[in-house]
């Protein structure tokens, strides 16, 4: 798997500060240049029993920063806490080798993208996304588009949008300074010993509503500071 996501993100990152990583997580120095709610100071992915826990701790209150509502889908903003991983897209229900697999906790007040037509625009919620390079995006990356007339393999909770995105109903909690997602490890192949990093980012729907439909627009912070997915999923002893 390439490191294109983190390499491109680094070009926009306002605070790629030194960090250190081990099996307990990736730790980063705080930065006043980053909004406190997006200023990652620690991120981790661990396994306890039959559950996996993705966690990010920030300098401020998790979830306190959200994009302004515009009332329109075109050009709508998305804020996200993201864990880019070394997983293959086939590990989360898509065709193999489609791009960079990331778990993201997102907020977007102008549209819903829950599974089965559900509403989620007013809450932070999780997605699996597959990312790829695209020079048309300000951040150099997009959520992979599904071309018209094609029918690739998608997970059962795909929200029926033309993107490689999944909307699983994982337990998601934003409390104090921490964002946490808990999911059954049986649902994700290859997670044990997988590499990961932590990123906070803004994305945006294309104002023209054509591909690339959803672009990485801005990056607030990369936990590792060196764009190398240095984290390794830990297992409780």
Residue ranges and their predicted role:
Residues 8-16:
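Bacterial N-terminal signal peptides
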Residues 134-184:
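Short helix-loop boundary/capping segments
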Residues 83-89, 192-237:
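Acidic/polar low-complexity flexible segments
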Residues 22, 41, 65-74, 191-201:
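Extracellular/secreted glycoprotein ectodomains characterized by long, lumenal stretches
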Residues 1-6:
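Bacterial N-terminal signal peptides that target proteins for export
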Residues 17-21:
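Sec/Tat signal peptide C-region and signal peptidase I cleavage site
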Residues 34-132:
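Surface-exposed, glycine/proline- and aromatic-rich loop segments on solvent-exposed faces
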């Amino acid at each position: 798997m390439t490191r294109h996501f983190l390499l491109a993100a680094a070009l926009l990152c306002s605070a790629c500060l030194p960090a250190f990583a081990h099996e307990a997580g990736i730790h980063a120095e705080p930065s006043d240049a980053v909004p406190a709610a997006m200023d990652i100071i620690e991120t981790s992915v661990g396994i306890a029993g039959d559950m996996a826990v993705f966690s990010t701790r920030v300098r401020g209150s998790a979830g306190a920063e959200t994009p302004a509502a515009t009332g329109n889908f075109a050009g709508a903003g998305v804020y996200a806490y993201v864990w880019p991983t070394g997983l293959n897209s086939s590990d989360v229900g898509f065709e193999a080798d489609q791009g960079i697999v990331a778990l993201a906790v997102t907020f977007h007040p102008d549209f819903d993208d829950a599974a089965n037509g559900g509403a989620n625009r007013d809450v932070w919620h999780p997605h699996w996304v597959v990312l790829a390079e695209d020079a048309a995006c300000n951040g150099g990356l997009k959520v992979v588009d599904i071309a018209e007339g094609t029918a690739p393999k998608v997970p059962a909770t795909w929200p029926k949008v033309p993107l490689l995105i999944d909307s699983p109903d994982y337990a998601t909690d934003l409390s104090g300074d921490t964002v946490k997602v808990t999911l059954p490890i049986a649902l994700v192949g290859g997670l044990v010993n997988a590499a990961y990093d932590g990123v906070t980012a803004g994305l945006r729907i294309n104002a023209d509503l054509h591909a690339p439909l959803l672009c990485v627009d801005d990056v607030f912070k990369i936990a590792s500071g060196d764009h190398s997915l240095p984290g390794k999923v830990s297992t409780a002893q």
